[in-house]
A protein has these predicted regions:
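Long, low-complexity, charged/polar intrinsically disordered regions in eukaryotic proteins
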Residues: 1-34
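Long, charge-rich, low-complexity alpha-helical segments
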Residues: 31-158, 164-166
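Extended, hydrophobic interaction surfaces within ordered domains
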Residues: 42-93, 270-357
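Glycine-rich phosphate-binding loop and adjoining beta1-alpha1-beta2 segment
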Residues: 152-188, 203
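E1/E1-like adenylate-forming module used to activate ubiquitin-like modifiers
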Residues: 187, 191-194, 199-295
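Short, aromatic/basic amphipathic alpha-helical patches
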Residues: 143-147, 166-179, 220-221, 519-528, ...
Length: 661
């Protein structure tokens, strides 16, 4: 392919290093290394390198050498360009950066060039930016030094009062900087917490550092910056950790910092500042001193440099950097928007119309989507793991779930189990999403929430107090399946009331002749192998849908309801097997939740007529609803969707409530 030599203006990247080797030349940069063969290759590169400064076209370079060498020169330069060591800067935008400044900040410019175009212009714009540095103490002093060294012409300092601030030390930093860049200055701005808009006035970017948990200020500052058309980024030190970021663009999500903080505290509710208030009374970490202060400041300065020069253009404000002040280790932590950080959205019944036609989400797809929910510090889930749990006869997985609004008393584990580790993980994820949705309530949505009548599909308003916090939540791969599961869960909530009014013993099932699902038959065989005695009593009569009580000599294991009798029996056998495994392995964490015991006087025996093990009839959704509404009312399915991300990830999490009137 012919190359227009006048459309190539080659410039050697600043990080390129060339070494003579026996085969020719070895060239290396941050892109990697390559061997260029040829006896004179090394000399050629050394000779032309000073001319590869972007000021001449390839045609002009070739014209400067004898005609016999022009083809070889063009071939070598194009080869270097193809491997990424030479860049075509023909389309780079013009700049007015002086040669002295370009030399002084050559490393900064080379770094920009590695990622994007027009590095001199981008650095020039960065240098002229109004970067406001807000905060206090040694961190603010170190940040001022970092900004001067990065090339900002006039950093603007806005000191707050919670920590002593040494202006003389900043003056020393400025004097050192002016030795190589005499144009640099320091400006000051008097501010206070009540007027954060003054901090951000006329700023290109606001950088805030707090050596203690100044959470309210950190929460409000991004909005003030956004209102002024400025980007923002922060460092907030809590305990022995500095939390850096997120970087929020001038048109970015001003709620991102609050979302990150709320997510963090949902997994660490004892964190100082979980109340969203400033805590100037807290002493800074003993490890925040010496070079550690400069390292933290440099992290923030570097984040601002990448943003203002366009290196990170297009990236979202979706992660924090955790800097451990004791070990100096860093880690990135992704987070999702927190519903209470976002603007309030009224409960809208119109959203319900889309549920029936929504695309199904099976267990495999749900587990894939849940990956975005996991982070050990800022995730909806802290981890998905098997720990050291016994994996026979059932596989067991655990998800540590965050407590998003403080209704659960802190993060809590949720378990899943099955016949394979894939199944146990998928079930654990589904159970975890249900439990998270059950405690994720946004009180700003009001006292009335909307759901759908299970039978008619009509929108119905219900009391929010009847829905949240949900004692039970259910889900399915689609809306009809979710409604069936929710109705069965609602029936399960009525078991205790049914026991309190029962006067006759419940029929005991003869398991030898019972019609079981294939999985249920396997569970029954496993219970026989481990020699776990158990009894099953049929509670279906008073509840109006298949419901069984499972008991062992150790007590009542579970009450299970479902519209399908075989499925209900299968689930109960599974929980009985899980209870055995938990007890045998001395691992109570994943044992089925405790339930009220089935009274001895309500435990019937197997009669001759029951010897066939006949199961109660399965019921339709209409029959199950009729059983739940014997005393009137209607069953309403209310989506537990107060977290918008959850509503997209798993749209079919629901609670069924009986509504009267």
């Amino acid at each position: 392919m012919e190359v227009d030599v006048e459309r190539v203006r080659p410039r050697l990247r600043g990080d390129v290093y060339v070494m003579r080797v026996q085969e020719g030349a070895y060239i290396r940069s941050n892109l990697g290394g390559a061997m260029l063969k040829g006896a004179s290759t090394y000399e050629w590169i050394q000779r032309i390198a000073p001319m590869l400064d972007g000021t001449r076209t390839l045609g002009e370079l070739c014209a400067a050498v004898p005609e016999s060498s022009r083809a070889a020169l063009a071939k070598l330069i194009l080869l270097l360009q193809g491997k990424g060591y030479v860049k075509n800067v023909l389309d780079d935008r013009p700049h007015t950066l002086t040669a002295d400044l370009a030399t002084t900040y050559a490393a900064n410019i080379a770094f920009i060039e590695y990622f994007t175009d027009s590095p001199e212009l981008r650095f020039e714009l960065y240098r002229g930016s109004t970067v406001v540095l807000a905060g206090s103490g040694p961190l603010l002093q170190a940040l001022a030094n970092s900004q001067l060294r990065a090339g900002v012409r006039t950093p603007v300092l806005a000191p707050f009062a919670e920590s002593p601030f040494d202006r003389d030390r900043v003056a020393e930093h400025l004097a050192v900087a002016q030795a190589q860049d005499p144009e640099q200055r320091i400006a000051y701005r008097d501010v206070e917490d009540r007027h954060l808009d003054r901090v951000a006035a006329d700023a290109t970017m606001v950088l805030h550092v707090a050596d203690r948990p100044m959470i309210e200020r950190a929460r409000l500052l991004p909005a003030a910056a956004g209102a002024a058309g400025a980007a923002s980024a922060q460092v907030v030190v809590v305990g022995d950790q500095a939390w850096i970021g997120p970087v929020i663009g001038k048109d970015g999500d001003a709620t991102a910092w609050e979302s990150a903080w709320r997510r963090l505290c949902a997994l660490a509710p004892d964190y100082v500042g979980a109340d969203l208030r400033d805590h100037p009374e807290v002493a800074p970490s003993e490890f925040l001193r010496g070079p550690t202060v400069a390292l933290v400041a440099n992290h923030l300065c570097f984040a601002a440099f990448r943003h203002l020069t366009g290196i990170d253009e297009g990236t979202g404000a979706d992660h924090l950097v955790r800097f451990d002040l004791e070990t100096l280790e860093t880690a990135n932590h992704a987070f999702l928007p927190h519903p209470l950080a976002l603007p309030a959205v009224p409960d809208d019944p119109a959203r319900l119309a889309a549920l029936a036609a929504a695309v199904p989400v099976d267990d495999e797809e749900l587990a894939r989507r849940a990956v975005d929910c996991v982070d050990p510090r800022t995730g909806v889930f802290a981890e998905i793991t098997e720990r050291d749990y016994e994996q026979l006869p059932l596989f067991v997985s655990e998800v540590m779930v965050s407590d998003p609004v403080g209704l659960a008393g802190g993060p809590f584990p949720v378990h899943g189990w099955g016949e394979s580790v894939v199944e146990s993980r998928q079930r654990a994820v589904r159970n975890a999403l249900e439990r998270y949705a059950a405690v994720m309530v946004d009180p700003r949505k009001g006292d009335r929430l909307h759901g759908l009548d299970v039978l008619t599909g009509e929108p119905v308003a219900v009391d929010a107090a009847a829905v949240f916090p949900a004692r039970t939540a259910a889900s399915g791969s689609d809306w009809p399946e979710a409604m069936r599961a929710a109705v069965a869960a609602a029936a399960g909530e009525m078991v205790v009331a049914a026991l309190s009014t029962a006067t006759e013993p419940f029929r005991r099932l003869a398991m030898d002749g019972a019609e079981l699902t294939p999985r249920g038959a396997r569970y029954l065989k496993l219970l026989e192998i481990v020699e776990q005695p158990f009894e099953v009593h049929d509670l279906s009569g008073p509840l109006g849908l298949p419901t069984f009580a499972f008991t062992t000599p150790k007590g009542t294991v579970a009450y299970v309801s479902d519209l399908d009798a075989g499925v209900a029996l299968e689930k109960g056998l599974e929980r009985t097997l899980l209870a055995y495994q938990s007890r045998a392995a001395n691992q109570p964490a994943y044992a089925p939740p405790s339930v009220p015991g089935l009274p001895a006087n309500l435990r019937g025996e197997i009669t001759e007529t029951d010897g066939t093990g006949a199961l109660p009839d399965s019921v339709s959704l209409e029959e199950a609803v009729a059983a739940l509404t014997r005393e009137g009312g209607r069953v309403v399915a209310v989506p537990l969707d107060h977290d918008p991300f959850l509503a997209r990830t798993c749209p079919f999490v629901v609670r069924a409530v009986v509504v009267h009137g």
